[in-house]
C-alpha cells in the first residue's frame, strides 16, 4: 500500500539505482532515456527490476499512472544520461523513447514493442502483436517476432530475421535484409541501398520491394503462384531459373510482367539505378555473402 502511494507520486532513487517493484497483467512499461543504453530482458517474475548507472546528481524516477509504468531520469539541470538494465515480465508491452541518443536492446518479449530513438541502434529479439521500431541515425534489427511489423530508419540499415506477419520496412540511406520471413504482405523501400528478401510467397499475397540506387534480390519458391512486375531504368534483370515474358508482357522498355503458376500473388520489384535478381530460397543470401 505504501509503495502504491509512493509510485503514484514518483519515487526518487539515488546513484547506481537497483530497485524491484511488482506489476500486474494489463500494465505496460514506458522507458525514456535522454542518452545512454537501454537493455530490457524478460523474466518469469510478476515484477520489474531496474538497475541504472547515472551521475551523482541525477535521479531515476519510477511512476505509475493508470496502466502505464514509467521509468525516466532527470537532474538539477534538465534531462540525464542513464544506462539501464531492466528485467520485465515477458507479457508486458514495452515502449522506449531515446531522445536524442540511446542504444536500445530488447530480448525475450512476448508482447507489443515500440521503440523510437534519434541517434542509436535498435536491436530486438522477440515481440508479439504490433512491433514498431524507429531510429533516425542507427541500424534497426528484429529477430523472432510475430505480428504487424513496422521498421524505419533514415541513415541506417534494417535487418529482419525469422519473423512472421505483415512487414513494412523503410530507410533512406541503408540496406534492407529480410531473411527467413513468413508473410503475405511485405513492403520494403530504400533510396540508397539494396534489398534482399528470402521468405514465403503466399497465394494472394502482396510483396513490394523498391530501391532507387541499389540492387533488389528476391527468393522465389519453386511452386510459387505469382504475377511478377519488374521495373529497372539502368540496371538488369536476372533469374536463376527460366522465366518467360509473354507477348504483351513488356509494357515499356524498362518494365515487364510475367506469371508463375496461377499468378495469384502480386510481386513488384523496382530499382531505378540497380539490378534485380530472382533465385530460389537460400540462394540469394548465399550469393550476397560471397
Show where each model-derived region lies.
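Intrinsically disordered, low-complexity terminal regions
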Residues: 1-290
Amino acid at each position: 500500500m505504501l509503495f502504491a502511494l509512493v509510485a503514484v507520486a514518483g519515487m526518487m532513487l539515488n546513484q547506481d539505482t537497483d530497485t524491484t517493484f511488482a506489476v500486474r497483467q494489463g500494465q505496460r512499461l514506458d522507458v525514456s532515456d535522454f542518452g545512454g543504453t537501454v537493455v530490457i530482458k524478460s523474466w518469469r517474475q510478476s515484477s520489474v527490476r531496474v538497475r541504472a548507472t547515472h551521475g551523482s546528481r541525477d535521479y531515476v524516477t519510477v511512476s505509475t499512472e493508470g496502466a502505464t509504468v514509467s521509468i525516466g531520469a532527470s537532474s538539477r539541470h534538465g534531462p540525464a544520461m542513464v544506462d539501464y538494465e531492466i528485467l520485465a515480465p515477458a507479457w508486458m508491452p514495452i515502449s522506449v523513447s531515446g531522445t536524442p541518443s540511446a542504444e536500445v536492446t530488447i530480448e525475450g518479449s512476448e508482447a507489443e514493442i515500440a521503440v523510437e530513438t534519434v541517434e542509436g541502434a535498435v536491436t530486438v529479439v522477440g515481440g508479439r502483436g504490433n512491433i514498431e521500431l524507429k531510429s533516425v541515425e542507427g541500424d534497426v534489427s528484429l529477430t523472432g517476432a510475430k505480428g504487424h511489423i513496422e521498421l524505419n530508419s533514415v541513415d541506417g540499415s534494417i535487418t529482419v530475421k525469422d519473423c512472421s506477419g505483415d512487414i513494412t520496412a523503410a530507410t533512406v540511406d541503408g540496406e534492407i535484409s529480410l531473411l527467413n520471413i513468413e508473410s503475405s504482405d511485405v513492403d520494403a523501400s530504400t533510396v540508397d541501398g539494396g534489398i534482399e528478401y528470402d521468405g514465403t510467397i503466399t497465394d494472394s499475397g502482396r510483396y513490394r520491394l523498391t530501391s532507387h540506387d541499389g540492387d533488389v534480390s528476391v527468393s522465389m519458391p519453386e511452386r510459387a503462384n505469382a504475377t511478377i512486375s519488374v521495373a529497372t531504368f539502368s540496371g538488369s534483370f536476372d533469374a536463376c531459373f527460366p522465366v518467360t515474358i509473354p507477348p504483351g508482357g513488356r509494357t515499356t522498355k524498362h518494365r515487364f510482367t510475367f506469371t508463375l503458376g496461377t499468378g495469384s500473388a502480386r510481386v513488384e520489384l523496382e530499382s531505378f539505378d540497380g539490378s534485380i535478381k530472382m533465385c530460389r530460397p537460400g540462394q540469394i543470401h548465399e550469393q550476397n555473402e560471397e
